Structures are given as C-alpha cells and as structure tokens.
Design a protein with these regions (language model features):
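P-loop NTPase nucleotide-binding/switch module
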Residues: 1-30, 36-96, 159-220, 233, ...
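C-terminal effector/interaction modules appended to NTPase cores
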Residues: 4-11, 78, 89, 122, ...
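Residues immediately C-terminal
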Residues: 33, 101, 126-127, 155-158
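N-terminal intrinsically disordered, low-complexity, charge/repeat-rich segments that act as generic
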Residues: 131-219, 232, 408, 414-476
Length: 476
C-alpha cells in the first residue's frame, strides 16, 4: 500500500485559473449624494501615504483611465483596525468612476458587466432618488453584486465625526438621541429599498450576505466609515467572486472607455483591461464605424504618481506590458474610428482574429436587437428581438417591421442603448441608430420620415460632425 492519493479525474474536468486579480469596483449614485466625495476620499488615502514614501515608485494610489487603483498594502493599512491582524488576499481594488449611468451600462463584455462589484452611494438624509432607482435597475439587469454606502451621517444633528474612524466605533460613541435619529433614517431607507425588492441591512448585522444587501453608514466628506466600506467590498469580492477574479487566462480583452487626441501622442484609446495581458507590438482588434479593424500597439501608458488621466500633461509612464485588471492608455495607428463602449480583443494569431471579429459582430447584433421597432400589423412597439417572437404566431404572424421611427446618435454604445431604452418606454420606434457625431446622412434619413413627428434626430452626448452640418441642423 502507498500513502499517495491518486486523482483519477481528468485535467479537462478542472477549469484552468489564472492569478487572483484585483476586483473592479464601479461607483454609482444620484447627483450630489457624495459619489465624487467618496472617490476623492479614497484617492486621499494614497496621497497621504505617498507623501511618506516619495522615493518609492510602488505604494500609494495610482490614478489612471478614470480609475483609482488601491494597492493591497494601502487596503490592509487602512482597514487594519477591522482586520484584527489578518490581511486581504486581493492584490487591491480598481475603482472605476462612471460619470453617467450609460457609462456603467457600456462597461460590459459578452458575459455581463465588466464591474465585478458596485458601490451605490445613497444620501441617508434623502434616501432613494430617481438616479438611484435607475442605478438599481442597471445593477439588477447586469446581475452585478453591490454594497450601499449610506453617506452623509455627518449631517445628522449632533453627530460627531472623526476622520478614519470605523462606523462601529463612531456609532457607539454618539449620544442616544443622535443614535435614534440615525435609526429613523436607516429604517426609512430600508423601507424604500424593500419597495424595489431588495432586503437591506446594516453590514455588521447581516448573517447571510447572499440574502441581504449590505449598507455601510459613512461620511465620505470626513472619511468616517471608509475602512468599513473598503473591508466589506473586498471581503464580499473575495468570498463570492473567486471564480470570476481568477478568470484571467486567455486572450486579452478590455472595454474601450473613450478615444482621445493627446498632444504629442496622436489618437489614443483609454481601456479597462479585464482579461489577459497586452504588450507593445501586439495586434489588437477593435470595433469601428465600418466594422472590426486591426492595429498594432505602439505604446502603453499610465499617468505618473497621483496625476489624473485628464490632467496628466506630460507626466506619463511607459510600460512594455500590462496585466488585467487595470486601466491603460493605448497609443496605436488608425484609432480615430474606434467606438467607445465596445470591447478590445487581442488578435496576434489568425484564430484570435477570427474569434475577435465574430465577438465584435455579435456585440453589435446584440445592440441592434435592443432597438424599438413598430409592427406593421398592430402598430405596437417592441424591442427587435421581441418583435421576431411576436410575429412568429398569432394575429400578427408574418408581419414586418414598419420602417418608421426617429434617428438616434450617441457617443458610446452604452449611450445608444440607454437612449433606445428610454424611447422604448415611451413607445417611440427607432429607424436608425449609430455611434458618432451627427452627419449629413443622418439629416437626410430624418427628413425622409413620412410622419412629421418622426423627422427628428435625438443625440446623446454627441454633436454635429462639421460646422456645415451644424448650420443645416439650425436651418431645419
């Protein structure tokens, strides 16, 4: 007999996993509820730390691509009081600043949202607001787990804040009347979330995180409760998203946030890389106005130190290679046609190119199928994929699309989808939907509509392509 244990299972039965990458965290919230203050406070941890380690290239928080990367050592130091001597397994957190809900919606790949987990910032004094509800709907649609940052506890009358203190420690030090004020606001917020089908509970009182959404009370302005929020976010990601966070092998993929014209660099694209790695010289495939196209990476860049992406100026650091998950600025030829919100694919081999092209075309088919169209028989409005089912049987069997509708334009795929969704809710069909500036073809298409009410071009974060087009729009 031998003590050796023979594993008879095939290697093919065990999914191949890569290294444990940092979770990608998207921050959402209603205007003025404190999303910007929260991100600023997260960044301030790094600036304070960086001041004490100025000679070290590592350490601190790196700003890049509309994202804030919080390294593991900063997380462990910030949350030390809550960790009790333990340390996180995660190499860090990558916060993505999503300035609009359509931006979050565009951070997706074919498997769902690129964001692994989200933080929804809610002003505990105001509760749920229209954009909060919109955010909840998007999180539900993309099946993204999330944590609630119950912000602005400092606005409770008599609440005493202390920067960096945990909420648990803070709450126990407040007067009884102040605690009662908090409980009143807390239970009101719980009731509002319940109306939308979510079981909300204070994070330190949850027994099963699968059944309840965690609320972390905090003050983003003062930094109180920040360590609680970071600890809960990392803890949930490590506990429930292990398979997703180790799914890093295979050809590189990333979401294009935007195309920019940088002085001294030319056309560049800002990308969130969520799988694989990229090197200078790699061939990549992107979605363009005329379909998929390939180009070669000439440079991979990140801002130096704490510099913001949009204000980095000449303070860029060049990299030979980058690994997921990270944000990176890519310098390459022929990027001007790139469509923001689409997926970048590595395309070094013929097999990779073939798979990338099909994935990009499938991505566009999915967008095309969300457009609202009118049934030629009953004049009802359906999303295109639902229209096909509607006309397969019943009184409208064999009916065709009524080629009427408005023209819509947006700066990103997510913007296009958001606009189409709003129009569908209002029973307005879409005749043509494209990404990019309004051009003469769009004007001709709108003019050709038979219904006067549909001689319209609706733009979402976009403008006229030339001054001539702008003048024509004003005249019409």
């Amino acid at each position: 007999m031998t003590d050796d244990v023979v594993d008879e299972s095939s290697d093919e039965d065990v999914p191949q996993r890569g290294h444990n990458r940092q979770p990608i965290v998207s921050v959402l919230g209603h205007v003025d509820h404190g999303k910007t203050s929260l991100l600023d406070m997260v960044r301030s941890i790094g600036s304070q730390r960086q001041a004490s380690v100025m000679d070290r290239e590592a350490g601190g928080i790196t700003q890049h691509i509309g994202a804030t990367e919080v390294p593991a050592d900063v997380l462990n130091e910030t949350c030390a009081a809550m960790l009790g001597g333990k340390q996180f397994k995660s190499p860090g957190l990558l916060f993505i600043d999503t300035p609009g809900h359509h931006s979050f919606a565009s951070l997706r790949n074919r498997g769902g949202s690129v964001a692994d987990i989200a933080v929804l910032v809610v002003d505990i004094m105001e509760g749920l607001q229209p954009q909060t509800i919109e955010s909840l709907n998007i999180l539900k649609e993309t099946r993204t787990p999330f944590v609630i940052a119950g912000n602005k506890v400092d606005r409770l009358h008599g609440w005493r804040c202390e920067k960096g203190r945990s909420f648990i420690e803070s709450f126990s030090s407040q007067r009884e009347d102040v605690q009662a004020l908090f409980e009143e606001r807390y239970w009101k917020t719980v009731g509002q979330f319940s109306e939308h089908g979510f079981n909300l509970e204070r994070y330190d009182q949850i027994r099963d995180f699968r059944q309840n959404v965690a609320l972390v009370p905090m003050s983003a302005k003062e930094g109180e409760g920040l360590q609680d929020l970071l600890a809960v976010t990392v803890g949930l990601a490590e506990r429930f998203l292990e398979d997703r966070l180790t799914d890093t092998l295979g050809s590189a993929q990333g979401t294009v946030l935007e195309m920019r014209d940088e002085v001294g660099m030319g056309k560049t694209v800002d990308v969130i890389l969520f799988r694989g790695s990229l090197r200078v010289g790699d061939t990549i495939m992107l979605a363009g106005q005329d379909g998929p196209f390939t180009t070669h990476i000439k440079g991979l860049k990140r801002p130096q130190g704490m510099a913001e992406m949009r204000d980095a100026g000449k303070r860029w650091v060049n990299f030979d290679s980058v690994e997921a998950a990270c944000g990176v600025k890519i310098v390459a030829p022929k990027l001007e046609a790139t469509i923001a919100g689409t997926t970048l694919h590595l395309a070094n081999t013929s097999e990779e190119r073939e798979l990338a092209e099909e994935a990009i075309r499938e991505e566009w088919r999915a967008v095309f199928n969300t457009m609202p169209v009118m049934c030629s028989s009953c004049n009802s409005i359906f999303a295109r994929q639902d229209f096909q089912e509607h006309t397969a049987s019943g009184p409208c069997k064999g009916a065709e699309e009524n080629r009427s509708g408005v023209v819509i334009k947006a700066d990103t795929v997510g913007g296009l989808e958001a606009l189409a969704f709003e129009l569908h809710q209002r029973n307005i069909p879409v005749r043509q939907a494209t990404v990019g500036p309004v051009n003469k073809k769009d004007i001709l298409m709108a003019k050709s509509a038979t219904d006067p009410l549909q001689k319209v071009i609706l733009g979402f974060s976009t403008k006229a392509s030339t001054s001539d087009v702008a003048s024509q729009l004003e005249e019409d």
